[in-house]
């Protein structure tokens, strides 16, 4: 049986905790997969491969089928020190940050993309990644100023979908539009002031579309909305507050994906 790492002064703790920060992830070119769901996704994917696993003695038995590399067995206290959450699940892995897809290839190969302008809530981004993967979008594009998709909370909220959905980061809106126009992909601004209603627009949805979503607090800048091919809104009952960004994105992704290719 593997010896158990018990020292809270171990350099392994510092290495893992560094990945809690954007600076640490960039320096190491790695990120964290925490919990059995994320680790399992990492073991099954060709993207973002595992570089090192850490497990507690209990998890060594409980999650034995997930151990694709020789793990370092750690005490509960060491696992707690490594984890970014209060209730560590006994297993985590460091994963390599592979090169992300080329934007032009992504627009060429996709019929349905999502663009998020300066999204800053990691839970929202993780949920959008999960919804996009589950409901049929082919990829996600993030603007500069958006939250890091490799941040621990984003990875957790994606529920493993981070390993499946192609995405690119630090793409200005103008760059996205140029790439989309090359392949006749239409840009669709999702805004509360949109003249077109989603229910009707979906019936005439372009064969290649990228839906543009704004920041949680400020929405989509007018200058971006005006440059889109279409401005669309989600109809709501009078008096209702605007929907959460992740909820809006899920509704749009489902409707658009189902219109392009019915989900079964």
Locations of the language-model features?
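Short loop/helix-cap segments at secondary-structure boundaries that form the rim of catalytic
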Residues: 61-68, 105, 222-226
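Structured adenosyl-cofactor binding patch, chiefly the S-adenosyl-L-methionine
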Residues: 93, 131-135, 149-162, 222-264
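RNA substrate-binding interface of SAM-dependent RNA methyltransferases
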Residues: 103-195
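Acidic/glycine-rich phosphate/pyrophosphate-binding loops and surrounding catalytic core
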Residues: 86, 90-108, 146
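N-terminal positively charged helical leader segments and presequences
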Residues: 1-86, 186
């Amino acid at each position: 049986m593997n010896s158990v790492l018990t020292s809270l002064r171990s350099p392994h703790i510092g290495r893992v905790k560094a990945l809690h920060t954007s600076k640490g992830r960039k320096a190491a070119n790695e990120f964290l997969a925490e919990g059995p769901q994320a680790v399992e996704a990492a073991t099954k994917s060709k993207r973002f491969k595992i570089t090192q696993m850490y497990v507690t003695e209990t998890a060594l038995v409980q999650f034995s089928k997930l151990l694709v590399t020789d793990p370092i067995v750690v005490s509960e206290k060491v696992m707690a020190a490594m984890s970014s959450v209060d209730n560590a699940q006994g297993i985590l892995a460091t994963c390599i940050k592979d090169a992300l897809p080329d934007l032009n290839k992504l627009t060429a190969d996709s019929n349905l993309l999502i663009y998020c302008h300066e999204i800053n809530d990691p839970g929202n981004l993780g949920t959008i990644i999960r919804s996009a993967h589950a409901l049929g979008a082919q990829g996600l594009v993030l603007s500069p100023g958006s939250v890091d998709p490799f941040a621990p909370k984003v990875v957790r909220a994606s529920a493993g979908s981070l390993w499946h959905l192609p995405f690119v980061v630090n793409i200005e809106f103008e760059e996205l539009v140029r790439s989309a126009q090359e392949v006749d992909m239409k840009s669709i601004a999702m805004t509360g002031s949109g003249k077109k209603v989603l229910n009707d627009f979906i019936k005439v949805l372009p064969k290649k579309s990228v839906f543009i979503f704004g920041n949680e607090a400020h929405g989509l800048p007018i200058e971006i909305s005006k440059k889109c091919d279409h401005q669309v809104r989600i109809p709501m009952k009078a008096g209702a507050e605007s929907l959460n960004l992740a909820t809006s994105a899920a509704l749009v992704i489902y409707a658009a994906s189902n219109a392009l290719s019915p989900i079964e």
